[in-house]
From Swiss-Prot:
It is a peripheral membrane protein. This is Inactive protein tyrosine kinase pTKL. Keywords: ATP-binding, Glycoprotein, Host cell membrane, Host cytoplasm, Host cytoskeleton, Host membrane, Membrane, Nucleotide-binding, Repeat. ATP binds at K782. Residues 962-1294 form the Protein kinase domain. Pfam families: MORN (PF02493), PK_Tyr_Ser-Thr (PF07714), Pkinase (PF00069). MORN repeats lie at residues 20-42, 45-63. One of its GO terms (molecular function) is protein serine/threonine kinase activity. Belongs to the protein kinase superfamily. TKL Ser/Thr protein kinase family.
Amino acid sequence: MGNINSIQTKNYIKFEKYYYAGDLNVDNLPHGRGLMLYENGNSFFGHFINGKKHGKGIYIDKNLTKYISKWKYDHISNKVKVKQFDSDIVYLFYYKNGLIDHCKVYEYISNKKKKKKKKNDGILEDSEIQNRSINFEKDNIMIIQNCQEKSIVNKKEEIIDIPNNKYNENDDTDKVDNFSKKINLEQSQNNMLKYKKKKTFDEMNSLNDSIFCSSCESTSKSIGSDYISHFEKKEKQINKQEDELKKSKENYMNHSEYSNSSTNFENNKIKDISDESIMLRLKNIINNNTDLKIENYELWNKEQVAQWLSLCNVPMKWALSVYKNNINGQRLNNLNLYFIRNKLGILSYGQAIKFLQLIKNLRVTAYNTRFSNTLNLEEYEIYLKKKMKKKKMRENKDGEYTATTSSQAEDFQKNNQKIIMNQIKSMIDQKNDDDKSFSDKIKNGFFKGNTNIRNLQNLVINSIWNKSKDEFKIPIDENNVPMNIEKGKELNTNDQITGKKKKKLKNKYINHIQKNISMLKKLNNASNESQSSNESVTQILSTSSESSFANIHSGLSSKMLFHDKLEPEPIKPNKEKEENNPNLSPIINSKNETNLLNDSNPTKLQDELPKSPCSIDSESSSEKSSETSSETSSFCSEHSEFANFHNNNKIVKYSNNIYINSSLAFSYIYSFIIPPENLTFLYQIRNYYVRDVENDLNPNNELDFCDSFNFYKNCEIIKNRIINPGIRNCSYASNHSKFQQNKNRKYFNYSDCKNERKKTKPQKMKSRVFRGRYMGKDVAIKVLVGNIKNFTKFHKVLYKLYILRHTNIALIMGVSISYPFVFIIYEYIKNLCLFSYLHCVKYKHIYVSKLLKYYQKKFINQNFQQQNNTMSSDRKYISNDDNEKINFDSRNILRNKLLEIKCKNNAKNKITEKNNLKDEQIYSSSTSIKSLDTSSSNMNNTKLKNINFNKNRYINKIHSMFRNKNNILCGNYYYLFRKKKNNISISHEHKNSDRTIFTNESQNLLKNKISQKKINKKLNFKAKIKINRPYAFPPLQEDFNFYLEKKKKKKKILFSYLKTHSYFKSKKCDSRKNKLSDHQIMKIIMDITLACSYLEKQKVRWINLKPTNILLDGSLNAKISDFGIKEIEQCLDINIDYSYIVFPNNVIKFNNKHFKNKIKKIKIVNKGSEDMLHVFSSKNHIYKYNTREINVSSNTHNSSVFFWTSPEILKGKQSPSLYSDVYAYGIILWELMTNSVPFNYRFKSHLLASVGYAKESLPFQNIPPFIKNLIKSCINRNKYKRPTFDRILIEISMIYEQINPKEEDALMSFMDG
């Protein structure tokens, strides 16, 4: 959790094996209630007597499992209740004479069986777990008498007379008198009980507050004979009395219903009447009333509605429930399923639908009867005759109109073309006068009033027909007259042959149209805006007139046209074009007004205009993307294309085998769903930090993580390493004071380096976020694992999060699905999180090529010695600044020589690799690099050869791990046997390879372990097992494992990506923690509250607020990330049934049988900045892969315990919600004000015991009172007393006004200018 040296020891007393906080006796021994924190990570909270455990207590181990029991002088009295942190299963271990006798397992606990927990202790009671076979039966009359006796005994202040008359069944008057008297008795008893409760709770709260600073006198009364305090016994009695009084009230109320048997139907008091009497009355009403006018059903009363239901042959219960709820004919129209099932009592879903169907039939019959009464058949026949005559007249007019000649149509077209061209020229002249672009006028609706432009599309279509008469003939009538197409008339449906030909020709010439449109686009992009628009119009008209197009119906405007990429042709001057094209036909392709402005097909009017820079950027980015993403990127750049997806019946298959219809494909292209092929993973975002406990580090110190984790582990090699005093290779020796003394030494002192690295060794923060790129932008990619349960719910949740827009929120750019993974793409923020900014030493991460580092390590000594031989002896006395320059120049020389060295080595490695092909067929890419040529002219010394040989052998062994190209993605692998160092013996015979072979002894041990696991699985299903082990507390882990369900390890999944061979060096920037000013703190707090209040209004259930999710940019603007992750994970099934190996292009899924036959074991090895996957095959070979480890959250809500988690979650009572976010907000406020980590314990079990059960509070020193009150209200242990984020925002605005009055704000704004 925190630092080793940062345990809060102010209120704790240190003993030999633990720290203690609580009550003490005279001898300073634990006496009373207190908390023990053991050095091994365990903790205990309970009662003590003279330093021994005596009473109830909770023991919590490292794994956060709770052991609840009663103690007698450091010995367990009867049983131990064991409960894991992430599960609801409870185990009871029973002890007899110091031995574990048997165990009971309870798989489920209902909330009804749980008793109220004590308010003075956070300890769970034994009565939570009850056996289902036990049933308690009690008499109500005996409870009332016992309750009266217990409540009145030993009361001196008040005396109440209790009647001793028993209940007589014959006397009704005595019943009423007794009932009225007992009500008065209950009221007086309740008042007295409330008064007693207040006293007891005040006394117990005083005890609760005295855990960390109290004396033995305050808890002397809390220890009794049966280990329960005196106040707890009284509280139990009070709770019993309340339950008994409630039962007595119910009995008397039930009796009063039978005594007052008078039924008044006129006053509609049906609830006090029995159902039998109502049924008799309904039957009489139904038999007497026979007239029901269906057309006037809205005027029915409730009795007529019941009569109608009886005629429909439905159960009488339906009629009775309708009669009870006063449902008349007017209310029938407003009934729904919820009201029918919950109010009327018709619970079954099918019967409720049947009831609604009856109401619908009633409406239809009522409408038909009304219509039949008002309809006159003679008038209707006359209406039909007139309608038939109108149809015949229309058909005759259409035949006459189609008989016009083609010459008349051409003349009409030419006249319209001249009028349109004159209007366009006048508009262009107006553009030059006003200095406005032609495109702005179109976007502002300039053409909306011009009716002639509506016919532009028809003119272009007719011109295309005239140009392409040879290729395609216009359909003609019997009189050899061409049909007019100007108004978009449909062809004769009887001619099926012509229709088929037309469809074929349409499909044939669509590609030709696309090419011309894309060519026109690129011509317009290359043209200058300064040229007149007349020239651009003539250019496009010339290209459109020469090209031969097919006839396109106006209905094709709704379909999509994908544009092919063509190289733009150079634009010719106007004179050359007029010579080449003397006859220009002014034809312009256009559409309706809506299609001119909002259409996916780029019209030629739009092509004439200069494009905006955003559209040009989108085209350039689409060209660089892959072929699959080229189409989608062009559509995503234009937002006016939403009217193009009309075909909802098509099915599209994507590369990840997801079949979706075109409506979902619309969201796939335009919305937040991104194809996984367009994502590129660069590296995993891992924050390396060093806690600034000891400020002994210099700011210029450099840490080489690759060296510290990999290359300095072999002590023999490093001890023999020579460091030149003139040019140092080790970064540790350059700056630190201890290494300044070792300037003239020839050999490197490994012990000093090791001690320094222990102090400055960085810690790695776990994350499952990668840095990547999408559409040329840097993004942050979060990896979630699991199969999608319900895609519709998943789609709604993601769309809800995708819509959210706020300046203080990390925006979600999209989501990508690749089973079994879900990738959420956020915007990338470069700076660190709030936690690392406040509490961690900063490092700059510099990414360097892996091969460069390899050759630097391998040949650094050779190059340095060559230079040193040529240098003069005066070189030794050069200053440190000159040494750094020389070191930098030498590295540049190495980089230039790397290619030459690499070419020489490849020629020699080919010969050696051919001999090892038989043994290396499984994975050829993991073959080790042979030692390079060390027999150069300058390396004649044998000692230097031996040193380089040993060093190269070690470097080759490590570097072969990272050289492997078979990067895999593994899912849900589990260990088939436990790892023990003593049992596994690995032979390192293959020095230059990554394989090791097991011995025969280790194989036999593995088989025995597998057989033992099978036996343990059978024992899990038994409810009682006799163990007969000696006394142990807590129970031995082996005994506890008998009863645990043997599940596969599904919390860890290995994710790998195409790795660019790189590692990073980290250079420390600051040696001290960052301290924020008051204005910066208020700015960060305002940003957080604004974001949280916005998310609260958007009804996000859980924000997951914590310091690591608050990101800061360069100007310290706070942004919240990871909100809504809980809702997404609820839609995922993390328990995946299969294991996956995902290669770059395909996915292999195999089951457990395949796993056992081919692979024995898979193990993760953490080596600094790299995670290695070791795969043990059936042939006892080890394959090593370069991977990344991701911590997948479990299905339970208690997956993490940190200092910002609320106490109700620490106890495991409730799931996280906005109340827990308010608690975390208060912790963050305290963290900002004090610049320290709250509850900074070493183990999570210590935090759970102290904060969850011992109720430890935070110190509020040097915090202003107005912020102190806000923090206390947010950290309140009662979650319902915590404020909302809207209320917090109001309070913070008031605080800001107090800190910065109006005069100061005015002065600051004046100084800023």
